[in-house]
C-alpha cells in the first residue's frame, strides 16, 4: 500500500484545521503551503474545504500511478514526493503525460466525491438529475432520476481552475500539460455510471430510481494507461493565434499542392508528449527516476519486470531466503484456529 509522504500528511492536516478556525487563520494556513501559485492561494482562501478534497485527489493519483507502473523501470514514486501542489515531473515525456492526466483526474474525482458527501459547502448533487415526478425509460422498464447524482461538472471546473493555475508560462510544455490535464478530468466525466435501484412488491421492479455515480478510480487509471500506451508525440508551431501543438506535418499528394503542409491536431482525449522517454536505468532527479538498482525482478518471463529488461543489462543478484510461516491451519470447536509451522525457501532476484 502506498503511504502518504510526510509533507503531504502535514499539509492535509493543516488544511483540515481550516474548518475549525477563523478566516484570519485560514489566510495564514493557505499562505504556508509550499508550491502554490498566487491564484491557487486565493482559491484556498475562498474555499478551504475543497483543498482537502484536492489533497485526497493527489493521494488517489499517486496510488494509481504507482500501481500502473509498479513493474516498470520508471515506477512513478520519486515525483510524488515533492511539493504536493507544484509541478510533478520536469521532463516532457510520455510518463509526464500520464502523471499530469492522472493527477487531474484524481482532483476532479475527489472534488466530485466530496460534493456528493456534503463536504464542500458550495456544491452538492447534480441538480440536472434530481428526483422528478415523471418517469422515463420505456413502459416495460420505467425509471426516474433520484438519489444523489455526482456533480462532476463542478469537480471538473474546480480541478481545471486549480490544476491549470500553475501553468503560468505560455510555452510548449505548458500547452502539453494543459492538454493532458483536460484529458484526465474529461475521462472522469465520460466514465460516469448510471446506477439504479428497483422499487416494487415482493422483489418486483415496478419502477427504478437511477442516479449518476463515479466509477472505481482503478478503472480510470486503467483507461489512462491504455491512452499512455497510445500517446502521441507533438511539436510546437507558431501561428496567427500563437503557439500550438501539432502531431506532425503532412503534405498533400500531387504536384499542385505538394508544398502546402497540413497540420494534424491531437485529439482532445489523447495523451501527448514532447520528448522521448529516457531509459530510466540510472537515478535522476531531473527525470523523476530512482534507477533500477536493487529493484526486485523476475528471472523468467519477458514483461517489463523481467530481470533482462528491468536491470538494463547489468545483470541481477540471487538471494536464497528461508522463512517460517503458518500452514495447515484448522478450525477447532470452539473457538480457536490451530496451525503448524512450515519452513519454506525461495529465491529473490534483484538488479545489480
From Swiss-Prot:
Known glycosylation sites = 75, 119
Q: Name which cysteines form disulfide bonds.
A: 65-76, 115-123, 125-148, 196-210, 198-205, 281-312, 297-307, 311-351, 327-342, 329-339, 334-335
Question: Lipidation, kind O-palmitoleoyl serine: residue numbers?
Answer: 202
Tell me what this protein is called: Protein Wnt-2
Keyword Signal part of the UniProt annotation: yes
Q: Which PANTHER family match?
A: PROTEIN WNT-2, WNT RELATED
Q: What Pfam families does the annotation carry?
A: wnt
As for family, the record states: Belongs to the Wnt family.
